[in-house]
Curated annotation (Swiss-Prot):
It is an enzyme of class 7 (translocase). The complex is composed of two ATP-binding proteins (LolD) and two transmembrane proteins (LolC and LolE). Residues 1-223 form the ABC transporter domain. This is Lipoprotein-releasing system ATP-binding protein LolD. The gene is lolD. It is found in: Cell inner membrane. One of its GO terms (molecular function) is transmembrane transporter activity. ATP binds at G32, D33, S34, G35, S36, G37, K38, S39. Its main location: membrane. It comes from the Bacteria. One of its GO terms (cellular component) is plasma membrane. PROSITE patterns: ABC_TRANSPORTER_1 (PS00211), ABC_TRANSPORTER_2 (PS50893), LOLD (PS51244). Belongs to the ABC transporter superfamily. Lipoprotein translocase (TC 3.A.1.125) family.
Amino acid sequence: MAKVFRSGSTDLRLFENLSFQVMKGEMVAIVGDSGSGKSSLLHILGALDRPSDGDVYFAELRLAKLSEAAAAEFRNRELGFVWQFHYLLPEFTALENIAMPLLVRGLGRREAETEARHWLNEVGLLDRGHHRPGELSGGEQQRVALARALVTRPKVLMADEPTGDLDNRTAETVFNLIARLHRDYQLTSLIVTHNLAFARRCDRVIRLAAGVVDEVEPQSLPA
């Protein structure tokens, strides 16, 4: 697989001849320097972008061949996303933000809010469901965003620097929560991170450098 960006008359090759597999149930970290293409790779794997060349397969499904509508349906059905910034809707409560993906799917409000409360409890914020994002700390906002990502019960969690905007102590809390939910709900998780101590705790580590991907032993990373 390759990804090329055009800048004027110049082609910028982000990566090429990239090939790897992620197995069901694995927790995989994607690491690399800033600008190495980590987030772009996650976007391609999550059917938010297309490779310039090659294919991405989800089981037998060729993601690069999906129409925009089919890709959106695939993401809604199979994937949950967490970003560095929480992207919570400020005018809605934590409970309402978490319930939103289910309401968009057409689930009734009562059922959606019942499921949202379950996930509020899972992230330790059941007593904060009536608060709006501006009334929550950064760590609490990110935990709500994680609950929103998982409320649809996706098979795969995709996280792009989920602890990047948090202080060390809060980042540890959020990463531990991701790891527990990964295990408890038998997720497959892809986590872009610059935190090598967190990457070390994943099952596998994929490193991007100079347009090339290679796999490194997690225990070889600094603790």
